[in-house]
Every structure is written in structure tokens, then in C-alpha cells.
Amino acid sequence: MPVVVVASSKGGAGKSTTAVVLGTELAHKGVPVTMLDCDPNRSLTIWANAGEVPENITALSDVTESSIVKTIKQHDVDGAVVIVDLEGVASRMVSRAISQADLVLIPMRPKALDATIGAQSLQLIAEEEEAIDRKIAHAVVFTMVSPAIRSHEYTGIKASLIENGVEIIEPPLVERTAYSALFQFGGNLHSMKSKQGNMAAAIENAEAFAMAIFKKLTEALR
């Protein structure tokens, strides 16, 4: 079954938040998920250790450059989704993970700098496609987007990406206190006992975000 790689050459773009929200929402829908923490910051591991890991999720840390392909293949089984949270630099590990991907997500905040550095991830995907002689489905996911106002910077970056043929996941992952609280309390949004901001809106956005990615993943596997 599918392998989703979350990659960005820029730290702070929302990689781990994207991975955790996607993984927990898919698991909540009954999809078995294996999450691989390949980021030296160990954000995914911090989330896993903060509370009880939700049902249907296996979280693995200490995945190395030499073990990443083997680990992905070990957990790429029928009916399961593997989500790989990569380090925020271009590296051999990143290249090896991308080569195994059915879908690569490139998170970026709606900022010009994020878009510029995000272009490096798009270039890396193109290079891997050439190396392995197959297309790799990929899409940009906007993170930390204001829930109230879409800035001119955001709409401009989005329009430019679309003009250049880059697919974008809709809806974006909006800025919600509940998403950052996942790394404090662990678990998922549905089990969070300490309510953080507008939980209903956070859950609605997270569900729509995850289902849009799952739809894109299904299309990529056809």
C-alpha cells in the first residue's frame, strides 16, 4: 500500500504537523498507519511520547540513511499507509525516501521564502524521477494559513505554483492552536482532553485536509 513522504528543505515549514495530522486522521478513519521519524529534531517521536499513541498507528524512530529503504519496504503492506517525516535538508536519506514514495507532500507556509526553498524540493523530486525513470506524484500543502484572511502573498504564491503546473492540496492546513498542542498532549484531535481553541473547526479542517491527501494518493496509485 501507499508510501507518503513529507519533505521540505526548510525547517519550520510544518512537516511534522502535516505528518501527524494526516496520520492521526487516517488512523481515526480506520486506516492502519506506520509513521517513520527520520528528522533529527524527532518531532514525531515527541508527539508519540507525549501521550498514548492512537489505535491503528505504529510510530518508529531512529530510522537512518542506511535503514530507511528497508524500513519502508518492511511496513509497506496491503491495507496500510506509511508516512515518512523527513529531515529539513536535502540529503541522501531524503533522496532515498523520495525514490520509494507513491506521493510526496511539500509543506510550505504562505511566505515567499518558503516558496523559494520549496522549489528546491520540487527540483529534487524531478531529479529522482530522472534517476529511477518513473513519475513520482507530488503536491504542495500549505500550512499555518490564517483561518480568517487569505493574504495577497498567499494567493500570489498559490497562483504562481498553479501556473507552473504544481498541484496543491485543498484545503490548506490552517493555523490552529490544537495542531501545535498535539506535540504537547499526544494522541489525536478527537481524544484531546485539554481543549485548545476552536476544536470543532480544527477537526473539520484536519479531516478535510487528510481526505484530500488520501484522494490524491488514491489517484496516484491508479
From Swiss-Prot:
Keywords: Plasmid. It holds the Pfam family VirC1. InterPro entries: DNA_Partitioning_ATPase (IPR050678), P-loop_NTPase (IPR027417), VirC1 (IPR009744). Transmembrane segments: none annotated. The gene is parA. It comes from Rhizobium radiobacter (Agrobacterium tumefaciens). This is Protein ParA. SUPFAM superfamilies: P-loop containing nucleoside triphosphate hydrolases. CDD domains: ParAB_family. Gene3D superfamilies: P-loop containing nucleotide triphosphate hydrolases.
